Amino acid sequence: MPYVHVELFEGRTVEQKAIIAKEITESISKHAGAPTSAIHVIFNDLPEGMLYQGGEMKKKK
């Protein structure tokens, strides 16, 4: 039962997330042999200021 956590800067629409979730689900099913009904995709929306790389704040592009 795969769980995939996707962390993105906030601002994606529900429709965009649905497309991303569908493609992730299809890829895992194809390459790992898991049934699509067992694959969970969880989105975490990150507000700006919550992600740092190399000590520097990452900004939305």
UniProtKB/Swiss-Prot annotation:
Keywords: Isomerase
Superkingdom, natural source: Bacteria
An example molecular function term from Gene Ontology annotations: isomerase activity
UniProt EC number: 5.3.2.-
The keyword Isomerase appears for this protein: yes
Pfam families (UniProt xref): Tautomerase
SUPFAM superfamilies, alphabetized: Tautomerase/MIF
Residues at the catalytic site: P2 (proton acceptor)
InterPro entries for this protein: 4-OT-like_dom, Tautomerase/MIF_sf
Protein family membership: Belongs to the 4-oxalocrotonate tautomerase family.
NCBIfam families found in the cross-reference section: PRK02220.1
Name this protein carries in UniProt: Probable tautomerase LL0574
Source organism (scientific name): Lactococcus lactis subsp. lactis (strain IL1403)
